[in-house]
Design a protein with these regions (language model features):
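The feature captures the beta-strand-to-loop junction immediately N-terminal to the Walker
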Residues: 32-37
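Conserved ABC transporter NBD signature motif
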Residues: 57-71
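ABC-family P-loop ATPase nucleotide-binding domains
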Residues: 81-135
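Catalytic Walker B motif of ABC-type/P-loop ATPase nucleotide-binding domains
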Residues: 148-152, 157
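Helix-to-loop junction immediately C-terminal to a conserved catalytic motif
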Residues: 50
């Protein structure tokens, strides 16, 4: 069962504080929305959890391990922009993931990609932005990971692609895992969320269950987000 413990986490870049004394505890079996405007610290937090950045202060533990080589075996990461080699075909990318990740399910990836009707001989360079986003998500969700870190998976794509991405996440994630989705597009995603984190200027301003927000505050997550982040 996945477990993430973040304690007093701070990240500074020269004189800019991207994250300021963040403390969170996240358990398996949840889809968590990491919600905030652009520049609020969402991507920095996800990169720290994935071991791509190191903290200035504080700590992150994933199943009692600091982010590194061992956690990469159980963490599936979708970056906020395409990170796959443009010259590779779909078949080559599937083989690449199969070589890198022991928990990668080739048959599952092929089934998802086949449903999209993508020619396996087509290189990434010749695909549309929406198709690239779908393909990259299929590769990530074909892993039987314990933690899924999805950075802006629905940003910059059309509504039909957003619907596909959300369906793919819901139908393919491991229920013993925790899924963290960062976005500022709240209305599109709130129906799938179990837990909600609001982040602003590197600080956590709210961490609550989606159900509690709807029941106690009697409003949608999108409505609350607009109130909290009103200019």
């Amino acid at each position: 069962m996945a477990r993430i413990n973040i304690n007093n986490l701070t990240k500074q870049f020269e004189h800019v504080t991207a994250l300021d004394d963040v403390t969170l505890e996240l358990e398996a079996g949840q889809i968590v929305g990491l919600l905030g405007p652009n520049g609020s610290g969402k991507t920095t937090l996800i990169k720290l959890m994935n071991g791509l950045l190191t903290p200035t202060a504080g700590s992150i533990l994933i199943n009692d391990m600091e982010p590194g080589i061992e956690t990469k075996k159980i963490v599936a990461y979708l970056p906020d922009r395409n990170a796959l080699p443009e010259y590779m075909t779909t078949d080559q990318l599937i083989s690449l993931y199969e070589d890198f990740f022991e928990d990668f399910n080739r048959a599952k990836a092929e089934a998802m990609i086949n449903d999209l009707g993508i020619d396996p001989r087509l290189t990434l360079k010749k695909m549309s932005k929406g198709t690239k986003e779908k393909l990259q998500l299929c590769l990530v969700m074909a892993r039987d990971a314990q933690v899924y870190l999805l950075d802006e998976p629905i940003g910059g794509v059309d509504p039909a692609t957003r619907d596909y991405i959300l369906r793919t996440i819901i139908s393919n994630y491991n229920e013993n895992a925790v899924v963290i989705i960062s976005t500022h597009l709240i209305a599109d995603i709130e129906s799938v969320l179990d837990d909600v984190i609001f982040i602003r200027e590197g600080k956590i301003v709210l961490h609550e269950s989606a159900e509690m927000i709807r029941e106690e505050k009697e409003e949608s997550i999108d409505q609350l987000f607009r109130e909290v982040f009103k200019c």
